[in-house]
């Protein structure tokens, strides 16, 4: 007899589960971007997205969803570290940062 934990629950197929996962990923990336702009400089967010895309998609040949997943992990870590150090952004705002001169990179999903 096979292990019952290995069966797919009734009414669920692999396609529905995968589709739901992609929807969750897209929704979560947009949500974290909307929250991140309250705490991190936009240019930093854009640079993380651009570098994630360049490295994971262009250099490593990974899928768009994989790039979004890796970007999500980086942004979660950045927000965690920011809040751990004592977030005062909503009350005081951001001080001027030493960001690179020139035009900003294209916006990540949900911030266009």
Curated annotation (Swiss-Prot):
Biological process annotations from GO: symbiont-mediated suppression of host innate immune response; viral life cycle
InterPro entries named in the record: Lentiviral_Vpx_assoc_factor, RetroV_VpR/X
Entry keywords, A to Z: Host nucleus, Host-virus interaction, Inhibition of host innate immune response by virus, Viral immunoevasion, Virion
Transmembrane segments: none
Keyword Lyase set for record: no
Main location: virion
Organism superkingdom: Viruses
Motif position, Nuclear localization signal: 65-72
UniProt-listed Gene3D superfamilies: 1.20.5.4730
NADP recorded as keyword: no
Subcellular location per the Swiss-Prot or TrEMBL entry: Virion; Host nucleus
Assigned protein family: Belongs to the lentivirus VPX protein family.
Subunit structure: Interacts with the P6 region of unprocessed GAG. Interacts with host VPRBP/DCAF1, leading to change substrate specificity of the CUL4A-DDB1 E3 ligase complex.
Protein name according to UniProt: Protein Vpx
Species: Simian immunodeficiency virus (isolate K6W) (SIV-mac)
Lineage: Viruses, Riboviria, Pararnavirae, Artverviricota, Revtraviricetes
């Amino acid at each position: 007899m096979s292990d019952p934990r290995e069966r797919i629950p009734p009414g669920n197929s692999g396609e529905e589960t995968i589709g739901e996962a992609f929807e969750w990923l897209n929704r979560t990336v947009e949500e974290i971007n909307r929250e991140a702009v309250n705490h991190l400089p936009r240019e930093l967010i854009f640079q993380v997205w651009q570098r994630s895309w360049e490295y994971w998609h262009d250099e490593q040949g990974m899928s768009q969803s994989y790039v979004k997943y890796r970007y999500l992990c980086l942004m979660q870590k950045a927000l965690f570290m920011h809040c751990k150090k004592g977030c005062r952004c909503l009350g005081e705002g951001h001080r001027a940062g030493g960001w690179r001169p020139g035009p900003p990179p294209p916006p990540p999903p949900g911030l266009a």
